[in-house]
Every structure is written in C-alpha cells, then in structure tokens.
Amino acid sequence: MKALVVIDYQVDFVDGALGFPGAEKLEQIILDKIANCRSTEGQVIFTLDTHGEEYLSTAEGRKLPVPHCIKGTPGHALYGRVAEAVKPDDIVIEKPAFGSLELADLLRRLAPEEVELCGLVTDICVISNAVIAKAALPESRVTVDHSACSCADPEAHERALAVMRGVQIDVI
C-alpha cells in the first residue's frame, strides 16, 4: 500500500500571509497525485499547519513573526480544488509544528510500502515530515517529487532536496 502525504497546501502558504509566486502551480500536480493514489487504493493524508491566536507568543512566532494558518481563518484552509478533493476516507492531521509526530505514529500503524510527500514548503515542512516518515518507516520507500513541492527560494528548495537525498529519501 502507498500513502500520499500532502503537506500544508494551505491558503496562507499559496497566496496568503506566507504565499509566494508559483505555489499555485502545484495545485494540478497535487490533484493528479491524489487521483493516482486513490486509483491504487492508497491512503491520502493531508497535514495542516495549525496555530492559535497566541501564535506570536510561541517559539515559532518569535522567530517567524507572521501570523499564518490560524485555526478558523480562511488562511488555515486547504487551497483551491485541493480543499474540494478531500474525501471521508482521507486522514487530516493538524500539526502545531513543522513536523508531525502524529504523522509518524499513523505511518507506523498503516505500514505502507511507500510514502510519497508533496506540498509546501520544501525547506521547512516537507523536509521535516519526509525525515520523520523515513525515521518511522526505515524499510519503506519514502519519496518526494521535486516538481510537486516548492518554496519561495529556489536555492533553498534545491538544498532541501539534496539533504533529503542524503538521508535516503528518493527525490523523483
């Protein structure tokens, strides 16, 4: 079984508080990956970066003082047609940090042969969760499609992909 993890493809990361040009171009690629995963009876998992109103007083908020993905705001929602693609059998994980230990626990329980990650942003949440997935499932294939994730800085994107390759995550 394959698990597809769509990382933080949320309004605030596409065209909201921390959005950047080009993030919207991932929408169709992600939709195609979701459809492909479902066609092989895989498990689709979405993560949502999730903060409260007190975000600016948190450790992350003090280092990145841009309120974003505040639960209950439009910026917290999945972006565009990806939001419409969520089905009842999908799993949605709200995470208060870059990486999700809840995702690690879930992946251990599901024990997929392959975990593919896509979404935003490559050099923060995608890399964090890819490393967590590899640690949770050291014998499973963990992949990241370079064309299905992005970040505002193309050089940071490439550096993150290089780090992932270095820890035996397959960058395709």
Regions found by a protein language model. Give the residues of each.
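Active-site acidic carboxylates
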Residues: 1-92, 109, 143, 158, ...
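Secondary-structure boundary elements
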Residues: 38-40, 113-114, 136, 140
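Conserved N-terminal glycine/acidic-rich loop preference
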Residues: 92-128, 150-172
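Short beta-strands and strand-loop turn motifs
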Residues: 118, 142-147
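Histidine-anchored nucleotide/phosphate-binding helix
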Residues: 32-36, 127-137
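Short, charged helix-to-loop "capping" segments that act as catalytic/coupling loops
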Residues: 87, 131-144
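Short, catalytically relevant binding-site loops at active-site mouths
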Residues: 51-53, 75-76, 98-100, 149-151
